[in-house]
Amino acid sequence: MADEALFLLLHNEMVSGVYKSAEQGEVENGRCVTKLESMGFRVGQGLIERFTKDTARFKDELDIMKFICKDFWTTVFKKQIDNLRTNHQGIYVLQDNKFRLLIQLSAGKQYLEHASKYLAFTCGLIRGGLSNLGIKSIVTAEVSSMPACKFQVMIQKL
């Protein structure tokens, strides 16, 4: 339980630190989401390397996405993804109905615009993990009602 609280506090401090540096002119305001996503990318690469060192090879893309939704998500966020959908053409939608990093935000409509700040790191986390498993992707997130969110993963064919 303590490690979960530390992760949530660290994540909140990363977000506020990046946005404070933008206010002080150290970083362009438009680059904040990119910076958070880059941090998540590097963390995702490292975590996947550690989590998969003792697992068998994945047989296909869908197997990798199932690993991300079950094992990876459970380790990082203490629960599995609630729903995984695919069109079998390289697009996957991961839905989390109680996303841990959004739970501390108020559920009012006025806070929806701030949600993207708190999702950028996780988009990078997913993209970094997939990258280390040999899958190049674009990951976006959307929130229609708090604290539920959907991550869309578009696989880039080489």
Swiss-Prot record:
Its main location: Golgi. One of its GO terms (biological process) is vesicle coating. It is found in: Golgi apparatus, cis-Golgi network; Endoplasmic reticulum. GO terms for cellular component: cytoplasm; endoplasmic reticulum; TRAPPII protein complex. Widely expressed. Expressed in lung, heart, liver, spleen, brain and kidney. Pfam families: TRAPP. The keyword Ligase does not apply. InterPro entries: NO_sig/Golgi_transp_ligand-bd (IPR024096), TRAPP_component (IPR007194), TRAPPC6/Trs33 (IPR037992). The keyword Endoplasmic reticulum applies. Keywords: Endoplasmic reticulum, Golgi apparatus, Neurogenesis. Component of a transport protein particle (TRAPP) complex that may function in specific stages of inter-organelle traffic. Specifically involved in the early development of neural circuitry, likely by controlling the frequency and amplitude of intracellular calcium transients implicated in the regulation of neuron differentiation and survival. Belongs to the TRAPP small subunits family. BET3 subfamily. Homodimer. Part of a TRAPP complex. Heterodimer with TRAPPC3. The heterodimer TRAPPC6B-TRAPPC3 interacts with TRAPPC1 likely providing a core for TRAPP complex formation. This is Trafficking protein particle complex subunit 6B. It comes from Mus musculus (Mouse). The gene is Trappc6b.
